[in-house]
Amino acid sequence: MTTVSASPRPLQVAILVFDDVEALDLGGPYEVFTTACRMQQRLQPGTPTPFAVQCVARSLQPVQARAGLRVLPDADFTTAAAPDVLIVPGGVVDTAAACAETRTWVAQAAAGAQITASVCTGAFILAAAGVLTEGPATTHWEDIADLRAQFPALDVQENVRWVDRGALVTSAGISAGIDMSLHLVARLAGPALSKRTARQMDTPWNPEP
């Protein structure tokens, strides 16, 4: 596992959003990284914020998440800041994974990012984009067989919350994205901030996957 050194500027965190994205897949990481910014100011007032978070979509039109939640993207593929951390959530991903524009942006963003991570079935988008091609990975328990069948070069892991390969991290389903994001905060900004973030969110935090 690679630990990324502290940055003098906020690390750009881009969360991909698309129609039928799972609401907690995007909301969990968003809450973790933005809460970490608030907690940094409580732990060390006046220090630089560690993260700048944006939701990125194919266009600036509102995205309708699974179950009807509407999300207004902060940027589209042409205006988004180059991410240091790319988060690809899951949901009903068939359309997003089949979209050439989405695959191209994900591949380009991942190539320049320090860490690329998927939540749940977001692993299918990473695989379709050619970012996740082989080695260990995980996804929602319900989709493990499909991920193995569609991408047989992957070593799909069961009964883990996340799989960390350094620059590439995949998590299990839905709420596991919160755990993985806390893990990423620990890697990027230190375990003290991760623990304080988990406490603020009133969520149990286990640093082991």
Q: In which residue ranges do the predicted regions lie?
A:
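Glycine-rich, charge-decorated loop segments at or immediately adjacent to ligand/cofactor-binding or catalytic sites
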Residues: F124-L132
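A conserved active-site-flanking secondary-structure segment within enzyme catalytic domains
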Residues: L132-N159, Q200
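Active-site-proximal catalytic alpha-helix in oxidoreductases
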Residues: A123, V169-V185
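Structural detector of well-ordered beta-strand residues that form the stable sheet scaffold
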Residues: T116-A117, T138, Q157, V169
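Extended, subdomain-level signal for the structured scaffold at the beginning of enzyme domains
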Residues: M1-T116, A127-A128, A145, Q157-N159, ...
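Amphipathic alpha-helical segments enriched in hydrophobic/aromatic residues interleaved with Lys/Arg
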Residues: N159-S171
